[in-house]
From Swiss-Prot:
InterPro entries on file: Dehydroquinate_synthase, DHQ_synth_AroB, DHQ_synth_fam, DHQS/DOIS_N, DHQS_C
Protein name: 3-dehydroquinate synthase
Reaction(s) the record says it catalyses: 7-phospho-2-dehydro-3-deoxy-D-arabino-heptonate = 3-dehydroquinate + phosphate
Family (UniProt): Belongs to the sugar phosphate cyclases superfamily. Dehydroquinate synthase family.
Organism: Shewanella halifaxensis (strain HAW-EB4)
The record's free-text note on cofactor binding: Binds 1 divalent metal cation per subunit. Can use either Co(2+) or Zn(2+).
Cofactor: Co(2+); Zn(2+); NAD(+)
E.C. no: 4.2.3.4
GO molecular function: 3-dehydroquinate synthase activity; metal ion binding; nucleotide binding
Subcellular location: Cytoplasm
Length: 359
């Protein structure tokens, strides 16, 4: 049975279809593909697993030769995105084209940005294959590539026409990638839904064993929360920034260690602990909240400490480039309890240094 979550954005509203064996039926996508050319963008890891199934699903439609990119965060670059543009141009594909992102967050972000940019905008569809992309990056219209000086620094807000989430894809996901996705799942509980956080605490083993019902509930609940937040604040002027819990610290880890060395979710996990510790130092939460957050992340085998090789100066160098910085002031998303968070711009460098040195 398929679960549908609707992201309501007026004329740009779109459905998120969640279920099993969704690659066997093109019906959820058909309305977006009629009289269109289709270009699938995927990577070298996903192509052998799912490209043939998706092409078979779309056999009644006009599919161009797909683009198969290298796999990894280190390839989330303008250079690789240019390969998408080259394929579009070499195959004479115009504005009547739909790009389909078949892969994880890197493929989704690059394909979405290419769609936003090509001939000033063509349609695109997300088919996320990793847990992280299913619960987070495929929903909400954030598209981007990295720059050597910062993560996701070049991009656009551009919503997909549809998101198709087949939970069967998680059966081929490496355990490390699954754990990385759980960092984003846990984030939703911390910032928005205390009951969901408690449910996660009670269902660790079910999720780690890929129990179908547990996975579908977790994914759908995350998508519901993400949709609710995006509907309130599509372009991250206010409440949507809460979705960046752990990301200011996490992006610093990714940039300093080298993109792809730490997975995004791993860096977010360590960053979430640092954010919780900062909250504790400010008196926003007591030690028990920090312990609950840390214990749940650790239960999914996620890192809960920063890299030993990173010092405060390395952190702050990258954190100052964060997209939430306003008038030169660092703005941090910090837990205020389980199920609630806030944005703080009055955290001193001295306090941050104390937290980072303790981590």
């Amino acid at each position: 049975m398929t679960k549908q979550v609707l992201v309501e954005l007026g004329e740009r509203s779109y459905p998120i279809e969640i279920g099993q064996n969704l690659f066997s039926n093109s019906e959820p996508l058909a309305r977006y593909l009629q009289h269109k050319n289709i270009l699938i963008v995927t990577n070298e890891t996903i192509a052998p697993l799912y490209l043939q199934s998706v092409e078979a699903m779309l056999s009644d439609f006009a599919c161009a030769t797909p683009v198969i990119l290298p796999d990894g965060e280190q390839y989330k670059t303008l250079e690789q995105m240019n390969a998408i543009f080259t394929s579009l141009l070499e195959q004479n594909l115009g504005r009547d084209t739909v790009l389909i992102a078949l892969g994880g967050g890197v493929i989704g972000d690059m394909t979405g940005f290419a769609a936003a940019s090509y001939q000033r905008g063509v349609d695109f569809i997300q088919i996320p294959t990793t847990l992280l992309s299913q619960v987070d990056s495929s929903v909400g219209g954030k598209t981007a590539v990295n720059h050597p000086l910062g993560k996701n620094m070049i991009g656009a807000f551009y919503q997909p026409k549809c998101v198709l989430i087949d939970t069967n894809c998680l059966s081929t996901l490496p355990k490390r990638e699954f754990a990385a996705g759980m960092a984003e799942v846990i984030k939703y509980g911390v910032i928005w839904d205390a009951e969901f956080f408690q449910w996660l605490e009670n269902n660790v083993e079910a999720l780690k064993s890929l129990d179908t019902q547990a996975l579908e509930y977790a994914i759908s609940r995350c998508c519901e929360i993400k949709a609710e937040v995006v509907e309130k604040d599509e372009t991250e002027q206010a409440v949507r920034a809460l979705l960046n819990l752990g990301h200011t610290f996490g992006h610093a880890i990714e940039a300093e260690m080298g993109y792809g060395v730490w997975l995004h979710g791993e860096a977010v996990s360590a960053g979430t602990v640092l954010a919780a510790m900062t909250s504790n130092k400010l008196g926003l939460v007591d030690e028990s909240i920090v312990c609950r957050i840390t214990a749940l992340l650790a239960a999914f085998d996620l890192p809960i400490t920063a890299p030993e090789t990173m010092d405060f100066e390395q952190f702050i160098k990258h954190m100052r480039r964060d997209k939430k910085v306003l008038k030169g002031q660092l703005r941090l998303v910090l837990p205020e309890g389980i199920g609630q968070a806030g944005i703080y711009s009055d955290v001193t460098d001295e306090l941050l240094e104390e937290v980072i040195n303790c981590a």
